[in-house]
Amino acid sequence: ASDVYKRQLSPSSILMSSGHTTVSNMFYNMASHRVGLVGNWDCVAFDEVGGITNTSGDMIQIMKNYMANGSFARGSDSISSDASIAFEGNTFRSVADMLRTTNLFEPFPEGFNNDSAFFDRIHAYLPGWETPKLRASLFTNKYGLISDCFSEFCHAMRKYDFTNSFGEYF
């Protein structure tokens, strides 16, 4: 189901199914002077966060800076981007056990899990156990919104800033 990002919902997203990438691939390759995935996609999604293998200090630090500011520095270059980063994964315990614990981010690799500043920069946590599983009764035989139309709408709306739109509600 997590391949929805790339194959079914949005051609503007990429799914890193292996969980492995490098700083050069993700952000900026200093040898070729080319911006990485965050400069070329609306959303870079990591499938199975527990499988993320690059937990180097550089990767975590650059990712934290990017998540906080929408920019990162590589060498003497400072690059801005507005790509979202999504982390997907399964829990290793039952829902009841997860609800009793205070660390819902346990599936992340140790390099991330020991960095509270990384988790401070996460904007949303969607507990998958609260999302209904897809089944025939959820589909309609009436008119509906085709996913590529919705995807294009979301892609076009990225140029608008709604950051302050929610202030009156919080």
Language-model region placement:
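Short, small-residue-biased leader/transition segments that mark boundaries at the very start
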Residues: 1-5
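AAA+/P-loop NTPase substrate/partner-engagement loops
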Residues: 8-45, 51-56
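Conserved Walker
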Residues: 28-35, 68-83, 106-115
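Loop/turn-to-beta-strand initiation segments
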Residues: 40-43, 80-86
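Conserved AAA+/SF3 P-loop NTPase catalytic/coupling segment centered on the Walker-B
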Residues: 40-66, 92-101, 117-118
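Conserved nucleotide-binding/hydrolysis micro-motifs of P-loop NTPases
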Residues: 50-52, 85-95, 105, 129-134
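A short helix-turn-beta junction within AAA+ P-loop NTPase domains corresponding to the substrate/partner-engaging
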Residues: 99-132
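Conserved AAA+ ATPase small/helical "lid" subdomain
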Residues: 123-170
